[in-house]
Amino acid sequence: MQKKRIMIVSVICILLLTLCACGTKKQEKKADTVDFSSLSKTGSMELNYATQYSVDEYDGYKMITIVDDGRFLLIPEGVVVPQNIPEDVTVLQQPLDKTYLVSTSVMDLVRQIDAMSDIRLSGTKEDGWYVEEAREAMEEGDILYAGKYSAPDYEMILDEGCNLAIENTMIYHNPEVKEKLEELGIPVLVERSSYESHPLGRLEWIRLYGVLFDNCLLYTSDAADEL
């Protein structure tokens, strides 16, 4: 009788696993055919001071808009890239763990959200960093110098598999550099925190980096205020 019960339970488990597998396949098939036009806005990040960027949610994706820089569709790790994305939208696929950070002011914010491991390349030499952790990371080889904003080492950037370049508005003095990076398939995000009129608006850019580097705790304003 005991053996019979075990056999029945085993059969039920197999059936349940089969059903789950079928359901997963159906979900995967559905996910493989996501079209950008079918995405619906489901929410927005509430910003208290920053005016130079916004983040809107679309069915699990996030649309980041930077004033005078464009729109970026953030794709979570393991999630399919939607089809028919407009040409003016740049795709960012997480994890963004090979970032080329040129804007020096961003590093301290990245440090505060414990995301320095996502910075692989620097536009500042080791002795030019005022952020001690950045200097130490370069000493240990965790962050490599890849050239300043006006003369990046394209070969190194490609060899390291760079998946995001964060620049400041100085890049507009050398637009050919931005164009070259994009031509090589590297998305370029120009941060504009210096254009915020309110001092706390500049600090609120930390929440954007929380989104980019997948620190979901910073999505709410209350959590950001605790930093």
Question: Which residues fall in each region the model found?
Answer:
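Hydrophobic helical h-region of N-terminal Sec-dependent signal peptides
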Residues: 10-17
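C-terminal motif of bacterial Sec signal peptides marking the signal peptidase cleavage site
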Residues: 19-21
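Bacterial signal peptide processing site
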Residues: 23-25
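Charged, glycine-enriched surface loops/patches
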Residues: 174-214
